[in-house]
Amino acid sequence: MMQKKKLQPPLLVTIAALVLCLPLLLTGCGNSKNAPVPSVVILPEIDTELTEATPVPPMPQPLTWGASLLWNADLLMALGQCNRDKASVREQEIRRKEIYERRPEPGGGAAAR
């Protein structure tokens, strides 16, 4: 017959410590919650020259038929500049949407689809 080997006391203490501590280590993080990380959104700046006020040509004094004709031409040029500025803002908005539509969703939203 084979004799059972007796474990030495330091080995028994080590095994007992492992048996007592391992369940605590395995269940210690079971109730922890992951805090959501806020996403940082940096919006692109719109050019300041596009948001500046368009100068309005002053009304000539005295307002004659000839001066009125020149003033209307100046007003139409100012209106044209406003329309070009608005078109540039629309182009920048389209570019911004294209950039931010390509970004991954925060929190791994692509995996949930």
Curated annotation (Swiss-Prot):
Q: Where is the lipid attached (N-palmitoyl cysteine)?
A: C29
At which residues does the record annotate a lipid attachment of kind S-diacylglycerol cysteine?
C29
Report any one BP term from Gene Ontology. Answer: viral release from host cell by cytolysis
> Which positions make up the signal peptide?
1-28
Any one GO CC term of this protein is: host cell plasma membrane
Q: Localized where?
A: Host cell outer membrane
Biased composition (Basic and acidic residues) is annotated at 91-105
Query: Can you tell which superkingdom this protein's organism belongs to?
Result: Viruses
Pfam families named among the record's database cross-references: LysC
Q: How does it sit in the membrane?
A: Lipid-anchor
Keywords, comma-separated and alphabetical? Cytolysis, Host cell lysis by virus, Host cell outer membrane, Host membrane, Lipoprotein, Membrane, Palmitate, Signal, Viral release from host cell
Region entry Disordered, spans: 91-113
User: What biological function has been recorded for the protein in this entry?
Assistant: Component of the spanin complex that disrupts the host outer membrane and participates in cell lysis during virus exit. The spanin complex conducts the final step in host lysis by disrupting the outer membrane after holin and endolysin action have permeabilized the inner membrane and degraded the host peptidoglycans. Host outer membrane disruption is possibly due to local fusion between the inner and outer membrane performed by the spanin complex.
Q: How does it assemble?
A: Interacts with the spanin inner membrane subunit. Part of the spanin complex which spans the entire periplasmic space. The spanin complex is composed of spanin inner membrane subunit and spanin outer membrane subunit.
| Full protein name | Spanin, outer lipoprotein subunit
